[in-house]
């Protein structure tokens, strides 16, 4: 059997880079791309492909504030392990980034930011309500950041939305919290 690492593998990184190529092809004037970060495979692939085609595009990585492993690693200029906390974004709850992904991200990332669970819930609710799209919590962090920290007017920004692995009970809780937060549900 061949074991392929979920994020710290050059083939996985290259495959995920295709997303970046597609963005550049469809939106050649894109200014910023916001990418979820767990172990770093997705952002490493996208950043490699995009920066090769257009080094002026800003790549902003987004982590859960409960697991800021890549952010801490970049800030301290060494691979870091975080203890982590509870988060609904379990798909990116990675304690230590990959060695290969860390090196790529360290050299090319423009910025890494974090979001809280409440921001993620708001983004997921908005996606479901307005776009009828269900995205897992880990895949909604990029939009969560954009919604909370509005990009500069006139900028073309792309949030990467990915994954649909979500428990039905959690999905129900997110809808309930979203409706309650908007004053549209009595409890």
Per-segment meaning from a language model:
Residues 1-187:
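PLP-dependent amino-acid enzyme catalytic core
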């Amino acid at each position: 059997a061949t074991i392929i690492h979920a994020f710290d593998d050059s083939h996985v990184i290259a495959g995920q880079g295709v997303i970046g190529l597609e963005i550049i092809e469809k939106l050649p004037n894109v200014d910023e791309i916001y990418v979820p970060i767990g172990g770093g495979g997705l952002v490493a692939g996208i950043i490699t492909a995009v920066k090769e085609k257009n080094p002026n595009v800003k790549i902003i990585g987004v982590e859960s504030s409960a697991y800021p492993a890549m952010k801490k690693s970049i800030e301290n200029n060494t691979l870091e392990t975080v203890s982590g906390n509870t988060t609904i974004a379990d798909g990116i709850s990675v304690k230590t980034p990959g060695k290969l992904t860390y090196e790529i991200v360290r050299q090319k990332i423009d910025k890494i930011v974090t979001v809280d669970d409440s921001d993620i819930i708001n983004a997921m609710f908005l996606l479901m309500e307005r776009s009828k799209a269900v995205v897992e919590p880990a895949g909604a962090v990029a939009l969560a950041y954009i919604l909370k920290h509005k990009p500069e007017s006139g900028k073309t920004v792309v949030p990467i939305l990915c994954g649909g692995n979500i428990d039905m009970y959690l999905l129900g809780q997110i809808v309930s919290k979203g409706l309650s937060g908007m004053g549209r549900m009595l409890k």
